[in-house]
Regions:
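Core subunits and conserved enzymes of cellular information-processing
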Residues: 2-5, 11-215
Length: 215
């Protein structure tokens, strides 16, 4: 069944009629705060040489394997996912996702000018960065938005089959981390795996169907 008119992932069908919807100002606040938290987490991962997950992680691996520019790969990989989002999740979800991607790109571009780390241990970066990213994604998900890519598929599977979005994303990230063993230092891979677990367990614990029914 099309999801264009459905609530956020975790929708409980039939319980949404009397649920107060998020206002536009609340959605804007959520997009800004969610992407800023993710940008902070990404900064910690980047500073310590850790890997990211999802389509960004896949684009990263393909870049090292083929030499093709990361930006081109990331754009091409995301195209089918945005098509899926438009067809299955609706234009509102797709528009918010485009906005979230643009904001994250802006924050990560400006961030080095206002944020630096003198000392940051990779383990702390993995845990704190994972929590920041997980919380940011949670905010976006609850306002019918994502950062595209595999996250869209994870949300769709949660709607259609009841699979937790966090666990689906965790499985994807674990596969990417395993593939990265061929191009990245094993120690960094281990820390990256910790970050992936923290990020996705944050979603799995806090984004359960039926617990959150606001829209």
């Amino acid at each position: 069944m099309p999801l264009a008119g459905a609530g956020p992932p975790g929708d409980t069908r039939g319980m949404n009629d009397n649920v107060e919807r998020h206002s536009r100002s609340e959605d804007v606040q959520a997009l800004l705060s969610g992407t800023l938290l993710i940008a902070l987490g990404v900064a910690m991962f980047t500073h310590t040489g850790l890997l990211t997950g999802g389509t960004a992680g896949l684009a990263f691996l393909l870049h090292y394997a083929t030499g093709i520019a990361f930006g081109k790969l990331f754009f091409l990989i995301n195209l089918p996912f945005y098509w899926i989002a438009w067809r299955r999740m609706g234009r509102v979800f797709t528009f918010k996702t485009f906005a979230a991607v643009a904001l994250l790109s802006l924050f990560t571009e400006l961030q080095p000018h206002v944020l630096t780390f003198d000392a940051l241990h990779p383990l702390y970066a993995a845990v704190a960065g994972g929590l920041l990213c997980g919380t940011g994604f949670l905010i976006l998900f609850r306002h019918q938005a994502s950062l595209g890519g595999f996250g869209i598929v994870a949300l769709m599977l949660q709607q259609d089959r009841g699979w937790r979005a966090g666990k689906v994303q965790l499985g994807v990230d674990c596969v990417l981390v395993a593939a990265a063993l061929f191009v990245v230092d094993p120690e960094r891979i281990a820390y990256s795996l910790v970050g992936a677990v923290v990020l996705n367990m944050t979603l799995a614990v806090n984004h359960r169907p039926g617990r959150y029914i606001a829209m």
